[in-house]
Amino acid sequence: MWLAAETQWPANQSPDWQHIVTSPLIRCAGFAQALGQRYSIPVTRDSRFQEIHFGNWENRTAAELLQSDADALARFWQDPLDHPPPGGEHLPDFEVRVLSAWNDIQQQFYGKRILLITHGGVIRLLISHILQRPLERLLEIDVPLASMRHVCIDPAQSPRITHIWNLPA
């Protein structure tokens, strides 16, 4: 997946990011390190950008859960706020963790162009926050694998999502 995403970037054009911030989990951090090395961009790992912890469901596919825990999965999909994964992180706790990191990188890298490499749940939460959507509607936001969102943060304006890019299938 990393190579596929990297090859989509024009060969004669370097990205204009000044820093990369990433989840420390390998599927994000490995890609961040590869990009950082390729373009000589510093990389910072921040554990607060890790995916929501799925507890007993961790590392299991939806298909597996439909076989073993269909009722709990349906409740989670219907109302993730009140029905977290068994033994997993509650959505309000996830929100506090991610928004703490989000606020910190906005202060730390004020005025700079940052690439944040993270997971689908984190991206959904940040989009939901930027668009001021209720937390209980988090799962309505589609985040395809290896997609990119461009968020513009300007103190004179509300944050806005200005571009969405998906890796071609």
PLM features: residue spans?
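Loop-to-helix element that buttresses phosphate recognition and phosphoryl-transfer chemistry
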Residues: 1-30, 34, 85-98
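Glycine-rich phosphate-binding loop signature in dinucleotide/nucleotide-binding domains
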Residues: 12-16, 105-112
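Conserved histidine-centered catalytic loops in small-molecule metabolism enzymes
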Residues: 14-48, 74, 152-169
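Short, active-site-adjacent cap segments at secondary-structure transitions
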Residues: 27-29, 51-53, 122-124
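Active-site catalytic microenvironments for nucleophilic, acid-base chemistry
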Residues: 34, 38, 104, 129-133
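Phosphate-handling substructures
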Residues: 38-99, 140
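Acidic, low-complexity terminal tails and accessory targeting/binding regions
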Residues: 52-66, 107-112, 128-169
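Short basic (Lys/Arg) and small-residue
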Residues: 119
